[in-house]
């Protein structure tokens, strides 16, 4: 079958056999797989697995599913506490990073990773469940609620997903984004533009030190800054004195787990089903699997208009 892997440090399509690492796994015929910014970062790391941790497809009986790609043991204290995303045994192991992922014709996954799709959610858009769950987890972690002023910094997928989650919670949401098409996507979702004054919650979804500094500047005294963005080069916290004097709480957010006894991927699927405008706002390009090299080139060109680029085997 076809699969997207790196060849001499570049993305390419190769022929591989379907992995049989998990004898109890179920085979998903992939319909859609999103390109994540982390995929672009990992291009030069020499990872020899099939890429893709944002994907959806169909089972052998035709059932449409999304996939929660995190692998966990289910038995450690973190898993038992509903924090399977920080499992002590698996440590963030994920399909598409440590195991063959969804940028392929088929992928074999553990049955516990399947996400049922609510009515109204198309399988072609269900690849957005995974990144939306990241935003769901970040907003859950800082208790975003109705009546709050929320600023989202960063107009990529996680930033726009955070806009959608915060709006669904009833917050008044503004977006600060670098590119015009990102601003327009935020407006389609209902976000305002960043304004003067202080915010109760700031979501830092840009992944830069300057964005963290802006977040600390913008949050009210006693407020909270959530950081769902990945800082690949590490982060020296800016504005440390202001951070202390305002008693700002920094809350990092990594992937997703459970909230009030429910998987956050299921919460994300439910939200996506009733927010069809999200897919329309963020999915800017769709490519066939054979065109993966061009799709990755487009995905890397944020200034050129790409937000979420999707591969469709």
Question: Can you name each region flagged by the protein language model?
Answer:
Residues 6, 18, 46-54, 94-99, ...:
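Short Gly/Pro-enriched turn/cap motifs at secondary-structure boundaries
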């Amino acid at each position: 079958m076809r699969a997207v892997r790196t060849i001499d440090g570049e993305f390419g399509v190769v022929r591989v056999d379907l992995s049989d690492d998990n004898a109890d796994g179920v085979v998903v015929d992939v319909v859609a797989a999103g390109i994540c910014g982390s995929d672009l970062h990992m291009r030069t790391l020499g990872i020899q697995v099939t890429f893709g941790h944002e994907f959806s497809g169909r089972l052998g009986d035709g059932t449409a599913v999304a996939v929660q790609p995190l692998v966990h043991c289910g038995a450690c204290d973190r898993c038992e506490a509903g924090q399977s995303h920080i499992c002590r045994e698996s440590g963030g192991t994920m399909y598409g990073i440590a195991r063959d992922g969804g940028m392929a014709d088929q992928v074999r996954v553990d049955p516990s990773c399947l996400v049922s799709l609510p009515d109204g959610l198309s399988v072609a858009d269900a690849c957005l469940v995974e990144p939306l769950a990241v935003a769901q987890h970040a907003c859950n972690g800082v208790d975003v609620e109705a009546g709050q002023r929320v600023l989202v910094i960063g107009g990529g997928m996680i930033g726009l997903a955070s806009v959608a989650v915060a709006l669904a919670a009833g917050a008044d949401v503004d977006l600060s984004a670098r590119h015009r098409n990102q601003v327009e996507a935020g407006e389609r979702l209902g976000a305002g533009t960043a304004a003067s004054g202080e915010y109760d919650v700031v979501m830092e979804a840009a992944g830069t030190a300057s964005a963290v500094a802006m977040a600390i500047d913008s949050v009210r005294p006693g407020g909270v800054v959530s950081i769902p963005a990945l800082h690949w080069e590490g982060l020296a916290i800016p504005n440390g004195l202001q951070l202390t004097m305002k008693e700002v709480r920094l809350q990092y957010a990594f992937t997703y787990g459970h909230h009030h006894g429910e998987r956050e991927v299921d919460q994300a699927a439910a939200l996506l089903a009733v927010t069809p405008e999200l897919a329309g706002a963020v999915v800017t390009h769709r490519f066939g699997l054979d065109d993966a090299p061009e799709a990755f080139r487009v995905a890397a060109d944020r200034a050129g208009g790409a937000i979420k680029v999707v591969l469709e085997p």
